[in-house]
Amino acid sequence: MHDSFLSANGGFVVSKKTPHGLRLKHLGIKTYHEAIIYMREDCHVCHSEGFEVQTRIQVTLGSRSIIATLNVVTSELLQPGEAGLSDYAWESLHAKEGDEIQVSHPKPLESLSYVHAKIYGNELSFEQMKVIIDDVLSGRLSDVQISAFLAASGAGRLTRTEVMKLTKAMIDSGDRLSWPSPLVVDKHCVGGLPGNRTTLIVVPIVASFGLMIPKTSSRAITSPAGTADTMETLAPVHLSPQKMRQVVEQENGCIVWGGAVSLSPADDVLIRVERAIDLDSEGQLVASILSKKIATGATHAVIDIPVGPTAKVRNQSMALLLKQSLEEVGNELGLVVRALFTDGSQPVGHGIGPSLEARDVLAVLQGLPDAPNDLRERALTLAGAALECSSKVPPGLGKSIATQLLESGQAFKKFQAICEAQGGMRELTKARFTYPVVAAKEGKVSLIDNRKLAKIAKLAGAPKSKSAGIDLHAHVGESVEQGEPLFTIHSESLGELHYACDLLRDKQDIIILGENP
C-alpha cells in the first residue's frame, strides 16, 4: 500500500511505499542455499501488491533484509496473516517464531541488466562483473537469474579478458589469506575422476620438504566423495581461519574444508547452480579454480587435468584450451600455474567413497604392498611438479625427491602430524553390507564408465555414509575369469544396497570386457 495525501495546491501526491507486515511461522523446509518465502494464496498482501508465484520479494526483519522467491501455499499450513521461510532465509534473517517481517517489492536490479547484456553477446567490464557477483553472493539474484548468466557465459562466450575480470570479482567477494613465506604452493584437480584422492598424499610430501601448502578442499556435490569428505574420515576438516593458520604455521600444510573459510564464497553459489543445470563452462571453471587458489594466498599452483571419454575433460583439444586459459589468466593475476595432463580413462586406486579412498591413501603413505600403484604414481608426479616450484629443486628432479620423501616415511609422519594438529587422527569405519559384482564371462577389461560407477557408489550411500561406496578390483587392461569379482558395493543399509543393485540391472555396460588376446 501507499501513504497518500493532498498537497497545498490540491494535487494528489503518492509518497513512499509502506511495507506490509506478516507474522512468521517456522516451517522447517530446507532449500539448500535458496531463500524462499511462503504465503497463503488468499493473503491480502499478495492481492494488494500483485505478488504471484515466483515473484521476488524484499523481506525485512529489523536491520536485516533479503530477497526471497515467493511460493504460494493452498493448504491450511499457514493461518491468515502468517508467512513462512525456507531454513536458509530463516537463518539469514536470524528469525524467531512469531517475529513480524515486512514484505515489499525490491528495487530493480542493476546486475540483471548486465546479465541481459551478456545474453546478447556484449563484453562486460570488471565493474559490471563485480555487481553481478555481489548480487549472486547476497542472494539478490535468484537461481533462475544466475543460471541465465551461467548459460550466457558458457560455450566460449567469455573472452579471456572477461575470465580474468570474473576471477578477480570472485576473489574480491571473500577473504584473502596471506602467509609469511614468499613461496606458497597449492594443488587442484579439475575433477570428474572417481578415487583421484592425490591431495592427501601430495600435501604431506610437499610439507615434509619444507614448502608451505595450505590446502582448502571441497565436499562432494554430485560425486561419491570430495577431498574434504575423504580427509574427514581421518581428521577434522571444519577449521576456523585462525585454526587453519595455526596448523599451517606449525606443520607447513593443512587439508581443510573450504566452506569453513570465506574464500571466493560466490564460487560456491555458482557451482551449486551449475550442477543443477549440468553445465560445465571453461571460463567459469577457470575463474572457479583460480579464484580459490589466489584467495588461499598461493603464489604457485599445480593443476591436474584428467583427460578421458567419461571424465570432465573429454579430449586433448579441450585439455589444451583449458591449460592455456589457466596459465594465461593465472599469470595475469600473479599466480604461476603449471597444468599437467593425466589419464582420465578410469578411476584411480581401488576405493570410491570417503573411507575406501582414505584406506587407499593410507596404504600409499605407509608403503603397504597392496597400495594402488596408479594412485601412488599420480601423486608422486603432482608432488614432484609442486616441489619444482622451489628454486631448491632442479627441473626434472621433483618426482625423485618426492619418491624419497614418501619411501623414507617422512610424508606419512607429516600426514599424521597434520591430522593431529587439525584435531586428532581417526580410525576408519567399514560398511555393514557388501555385494560383489562378478564377471559374466572371461575377458580383458577394455572400458570403465567413470560416471556410471560413481552413480552406483552414490546410490550405495556415499558420501553421506562415509563407509559406503565401491571397491574396484579390475582395471583397464587387466584380464578376469568368469565369476571373478569386478567390484564390490559397500553400503551402511540394505535399502541403499538394493538401490545400487537396481541400477546394475539397467546399466550393463559399466565395465566392458573384450576378448583375451
From Swiss-Prot:
It comes from the Bacteria. GO terms for molecular function: 1,4-alpha-oligoglucan phosphorylase activity; thymidine phosphorylase activity. One of its GO terms (cellular component) is cytosol. GO terms for biological process: pyrimidine nucleobase metabolic process; pyrimidine nucleoside metabolic process. Keywords: Glycosyltransferase, Transferase. InterPro entries: Glycosyl_Trfase_fam3, Glycosyl_Trfase_fam3_N_dom, Glycosyl_Trfase_fam3_N_dom_sf, Nuc_phospho_transferase, PYNP-like_C_sf, PYNP_C, Pyrmidine_PPase_CS, Thym_Pase_Put. It is an enzyme of class 2 (transferase). Its EC number is 2.4.2.4. It catalyses: thymidine + phosphate = 2-deoxy-alpha-D-ribose 1-phosphate + thymine. Belongs to the thymidine/pyrimidine-nucleoside phosphorylase family. Type 2 subfamily. HAMAP family: Thymid_phosp_2 (MF_00703). NCBIfam families: ARCH_P_rylase, PRK04350.1. This is Putative thymidine phosphorylase. It comes from Legionella pneumophila subsp. pneumophila (strain Philadelphia 1 / ATCC 33152 / DSM 7513).
